[in-house]
A protein has these predicted regions:
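Active-site His/Glu-centered metal-binding helix of metallohydrolases
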Residues: 76-84, 292, 531-532, 741
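Bacterial N-terminal signal peptides
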Residues: 12-24
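Histidine-acidic residue clusters that define the catalytic metal-binding segment
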Residues: 30-37, 132, 158, 176-216, ...
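Short, conserved secondary-structure transition motifs
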Residues: 156-162, 252-266, 369-378, 571, ...
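Proteolytic maturation boundary segments
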Residues: 14, 29-45, 225-264, 270-272, ...
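M16 family metallopeptidases and their MPP-like homologs
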Residues: 46-48, 53-79, 93-138, 167-193, ...
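Bacterial N-terminal signal peptides that target proteins for export
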Residues: 2-15
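Non-catalytic, conformational "gating/processing" segments within enzyme and secreted inhibitor domains
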Residues: 172, 203-236, 428-429, 445, ...
């Protein structure tokens, strides 16, 4: 569960806020059928058909959030969101967890100021199950005192987790400073003291008051028959009675005041922000503010220009909208040795010029062109499209996402300049800075997995499911994939894979060059790949950085060059988009002056990074898993970066960038013949230079046990990783029984063994999961969780006991059935977005797997036995050799 926020920089990045809201429909709405209805009880229903994959995403949106929390209890809405997963009359928490795990998709929720959303993504054949759950939860919730006592521990772990994030701490300070005395002074998270004082009757009252059909909007998106789906919704929801709604709290904004805020961060770079209060979502000025944000965030604008000038490492502008107000802010990142005050002066000067003289008109047109492309691209993800529709209608109060694009199309340059003059109010801006501070080197950690305290583990008994869910669990079958990719090889050795899709008028190109800097960089040249990557953003031999960005804006394209490269365009611009991508990828400018700026900045960043707790945690883990001479332990230093020349970068580029190690995947409204013609036209003349380099890491010996604690003064909670290395490759047949067993341990929601024992039954952690990682030559097994320092060893002991249990006894039939159902359902879910389709096809090529590998995997999972899983865990897992690495306070 989460509280959703909008923005860039220290908040989740949103590339063009308006695009994310207006991107469900193109200019011609009839290409995406939409069915709307309002039931007699007031429930608004929107069903959008999208046939990208046999998948459905549902979003139940209650028009209530933290704004309506009782005074002194800012996390009430968030707490009730958690308790919605603790059961309802007729549906226990155990049943809900089991069903959520079986379905395999996103089963989550988020709470915002004026909205609480419940999200579920399932195979299309299981849409009835998702709708049953949401109808049951709308009717009522258990909200028992015993459940709240347990859930309180988990939600307080979430609070601790966020408070361990310096970015969140700065965000909280910013909200308090800009919105003092209003509900906006706090976000939806809540506080530990308020949760300690919260009683279950308060939560039940909150649900009874606000969780009514006449205060909700249900959005269903995916491969469904809209009319048949609406009838299912009527049957399940129509009898839920409407209720009178309480009066809503008013937000009385006082005058804005300038302030300066600061926090320390464990990150290797600092962040300087300049934030201004602006109108909220429902203001008539909001569309112009969206366009202004896009203009100020453009890499052609002066704010980003601080980066190539060497004055900042990164720079952008963002909008964090709330219902009745919002925050617009510039955010720039800087190295540890740079002066944030000087950056603040630079940013103020740039924004002051905009307020006085306005924005470049060509950037307004470019912003609109990018919005049009992003609008069409939103149809390329079923879950994303559901989110876009839900936000547009429930949060922004629009009739459809298309309405926002229509508003943006009407915005003029004069409108943008007017809102810039009015709202870029630097005299009342809040300046905020995160200053990088190292917390020290790793130290040996005691405790390990022993200790005297013994924790009694409960049994992970599966519970009987309702009749409407039981059939879904028992259905284990291989559904034919909706994908039929075609693979071919160009004469120069480049592999081309084409997957036609027609859900949108777009084409996406994904590329990957097989590479390993750890083995391909020359001795003493560590960091050369890190210099090359940003250097590729400076255009091509024909078009310098600004000219290249302008060419992309002309067609509304999004492009990135590197060993992983891509371009996203409207179908009509496919040829031009590939031409620009190839020009950048094969003929990069690599200007010497940019090389100087990047090397100087990177050397400072690397120096700070190798002292940062996050980096020390990762390096400590690698050092514990692999021998001292392993290539993965090579690291860039300030000295190695400063010693690099442009010739070193060019030499690395020529050695690594070659067609016979490259795979390109094209997905979208394009035929295989057209794709081959255009890819061949622009990439066909590319030739390899010399012999293929070695791109594989060596097989590693088994690691020894150990425990390392990395101090991090900025955290109040520990991040914990338990790990061991594996001599397992992705193509090894044992990958599948290990993956199935990992699903039993930690693969889905909180009906897994680890989550039941570490979160649900004991409240020791907020979240826990297990991950099987396998590459071309080696693998690893991880268990990761976050908890208070006094719980680190207790939680680790549970994890080790569960690993032993997987080896000592066969998985129960119900557990195995649920894990199989989960993995089988994840197959169609992985095909529900164009990005996932493209990257998954590249991965299969990278690991020498057949393109229809998911079909093979499904048959393996169906036939697999509990004995197969037990044998694989006995063969590969070594609980006594687990390494424990913690980041945060001293673990106990």
């Amino acid at each position: 569960m989460s509280r959703s926020r909008r923005g860039r920089g220290i908040w989740p990045t949103l590339a063009g806020l308006a695009a994310s809201l207006c991107a469900a429909l193109p200019a011609h709405a009839d290409t995406a059928p939409v069915l709307r209805a309002t039931l007699d009880n007031g429930l608004r229903v929107i069903v959008v058909r999208n046939t990208l994959a046999p998948v459905v995403a549902t979003s139940v949106n209650y028009l209530v959030g933290s704004d309506e929390a009782p005074p002194g209890f800012p996390g009430t809405a968030h707490a009730q969101e958690h308790m919605m997963f603790r059961g309802s009359p007729g549906l226990s928490a155990e049943q809900l967890a089991d069903i959520g795990s079986i379905m395999g998709g996103n089963f989550n929720a988020n709470t915002r100021e004026s909205l609480t959303q419940y999200l579920f993504t399932v195979p299309a054949e299981d849409v009835d199950v998702a709708l049953h759950i949401e109808a049951t939860r709308m009717r009522g919730v258990l909200d028992s005192a015993a459940d709240w006592d347990q859930e309180r521990g988990a939600i307080e772990q979430e609070v601790a987790q966020d408070l361990s994030n310096p970015g969140y701490k700065l965000y909280a300070q910013l909200r308090a400073a800009m919105f003092a005395g209003t509900p906006y002074a706090h976000d939806a998270l809540g506080t530990r003291p308020s949760f300690d004082a919260t009683r279950v009757n308060m939560l039940r009252q909150f649900h009874d008051a606000w969780y009514a059909p006449n205060n909700a909007i249900l959005v269903v998106v995916g491969d469904v028959d809209p009319n048949a789906t609406l009838e299912k919704i009527r049957a399940l929801f129509a009898s839920i009675p409407a209720r009178p709604l309480p009066a809503r709290h008013l937000v009385h904004l006082g005058p804005a005041h300038a302030a300066h805020l600061s926090v320390d961060t464990d990150r290797p770079t600092g962040t300087q922000m300049l934030a201004m209060r602006v109108p909220g979502l429902h203001s008539p000025d909001f569309p112009a503010l969206e366009v202004l944000t896009d203009v100020l965030a453009s890499e052609r604008f002066d704010l980003y220009g601080l980066v190539p000038q060497g004055k900042a490492i990164g720079a952008t502008f963002a909008l964090d909208p709330l219902p009745q107000a919002g925050v617009a802010y510039a955010v720039v990142s800087f190295s540890k040795d740079e002066d944030p005050k000087a950056l603040d002066v630079e940013v103020r000067s740039i924004l002051a010029r905009v307020a006085r003289h306005g924005v470049p008109p060509e950037l307004v047109q470019a912003a609109k062109q990018q919005e049009r492309r992003q609008t069409e691209f939103q149809k390329n993800s079923i879950e994303g499209l559901a989110s876009v529709w839900a936000d547009a209608v429930a949060l922004y109060g629009l009739d459809s996402p298309e309405e926002d694009l229509q508003r943006i199309e009407k915005v003029t340059v004069a409108d943008v300049n007017r809102v810039a003059r009015r709202y870029l109010d630097l005299a009342h801006a809040v300046s905020a800075v995160m200053t990088p501070q190292g917390s020290g080197r790793p130290v040996a950690s005691g405790g390990g997995f022993g200790g005297q305290e013994s924790i009694s583990l409960g049994e992970a008994h599966a519970t009987a499911l309702p009749e409407w869910a039981r059939a879904a669990l028992e259905r284990l079958e291989v559904k034919p994939s909706s994908l039929h990719p075609l693979m071919s090889t160009l004469p120069n050795g480049l592999t081309l894979i084409v997957q036609p899709e027609d859900v949108s008028d777009t084409v996406s190109v994904f590329g990957h060059i097989r590479n390993r800097p750890e083995v391909e960089a020359g001795a003493g040249k560590e960091g050369v790949n890190q210099v090359l990557e940003p250097l590729l953003a400076y255009g091509s031999e024909k078009l310098d950085r600004l000219a290249f960005e302008s060419a992309l804006d002309d067609i509304g394209a999004d492009e990135h060059a590197g060993t992983d490269f891509d371009v996203q365009v409207l179908a009509q611009n496919f040829d031009r988009g590939v031409a620009l991508l190839a020009d950048n990828e094969l003929h990069p400018a690599l200007p010497p002056e940019a090389m100087s700026v990047i090397s100087n900045q990177l050397s400072q960043v690397v120096g700070a990074r190798i002292r940062s707790p996050g980096y020390q945690t990762q390096r400590s883990l690698r050092a514990a898993l692999f021998p001292p001479d392993d290539p993965s332990l090579r690291e860039a230093t300030p000295e190695s970066v400063r010693a690099l020349s442009l010739d070193d970068v060019l030499s690395y580029y020529r050695r690594v960038f070659r067609p016979d190690l490259t795979t390109i995947v094209v997905v979208g409204r394009v035929s295989p013949e057209q794709a081959r013609e255009i890819i061949g036209k622009y990439f066909g003349a590319w030739q390899a230079d010399g012999q293929k380099p070695d791109t594989d890491l060596p097989i590693a010996p088994a690691n020894k046990p150990g425990a390392v604690a990395v101090p991090d003064a900025s955290r109040v909670q520990d991040i914990v990783v338990l790990a061991q290395n594996l001599a397992l490759t992705r193509s090894d047949p044992d990958y599948y029984p290990l993956e199935l067993g990992s699903a039993v341990l930690g693969g889905g929601f909180y009906s897994t063994r680890l989550s039941i024992e570490m979160r649900k039954n004991t409240g020791l952690v907020y979240s826990v999961g297990s991950t099987l990682q396998a590459g071309r030559t080696r693998g690893a097994y991880y268990i990761q969780y976050a908890c208070d320092p006094q719980n680190v060893s207790k939680a680790a002991q549970i994890a080790v006991q569960e690993l032993h249990s997987m080896q000592d006894s066969a998985v129960g039939g119900d557990e195995l059935l649920r894990a199989k159902a989960l993995l089988l359902r994840q197959i169609p879910l992985s095909e529900a977005s164009v990005d996932e389709i493209g990257h998954d096809l590249i991965d299969r090529r990278e690991y020498d797997l057949p393109l229809d590998e998911p079909d093979h995997a499904a048959r393996r999972y169906i036939d697999m036995t509990a004995a197969d899983v037990q044998a694989a865990f006995r063969k590969w897992l070594r609980p006594a050799d687990l390494v424990r690495v913690t980041q945060g306070p001293t673990p106990q």
